[in-house]
Amino acid sequence: MKQKKIETDKIGLVGQAPSRRGDPCKPLAGPNGQKIARLAGLNYDELIACRRKHLNTHYSGKRGKGYRFDHAKGSVKAADVLLDWRVERIVLLGKNVARCFGFRDLPFLAEISIYGRRFLIFPHPSSTNRWWNERRNERRARQLLQRFLWGETVPAEFPKSRRSTRTPSQTSSTGTSANGSRATISRRKPSRFSRRSP
């Protein structure tokens, strides 16, 4: 029996920026793209056939253990993606990319359905991302990415109730994503004058 072909015209992948030696005109054409293709169970040509874009068009250098990222430029490019792309499913590679699309404080492997599209917040594939150090993370990421790309719904595993140790004025919503990591979304703006710990 022949396996159904993946619908690359319905899939988009959005990354932060090209690598130091990467070609700005070919998003995900290097090692990170190969890693995504391997995790997705796609051959490299299928990955390249999907819509692809970097939110920062050039490598910006390092900052600490990660990379510099221009959020203002990224947010403009994210708006362009929403306006221009006619795809059903978009994989956001990294939390910086997710923030540019307005998704803050959500865990990796969370799926969001909004704007008539589905988004998957996927860990940045770079080797500097320590999230990949745990085998169970990679196994779960592979499972969920493949399901998402084939159009299946990614299961969300948010608990029905969880005791909070916060005061009522610090109400927040806590949940567990499909990979078991926790996210907290606060409903209260932090005070400009909050005490800092010594």
Range-by-range predicted roles:
Residues 1, 164, 196-198:
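Short intrinsically disordered terminal tails
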Residues 1-110, 114-131, 135, 139-151:
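A polyanion-binding, active-site-adjacent surface
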Residues 3, 8-11, 166, 182, ...:
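Low-complexity, intrinsically disordered short peptide segments enriched in small/polar/basic residues
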Residues 137-180, 190, 194:
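Charged phosphate-binding loop/patch that engages nucleotide di/tri-phosphates or the phosphate backbone
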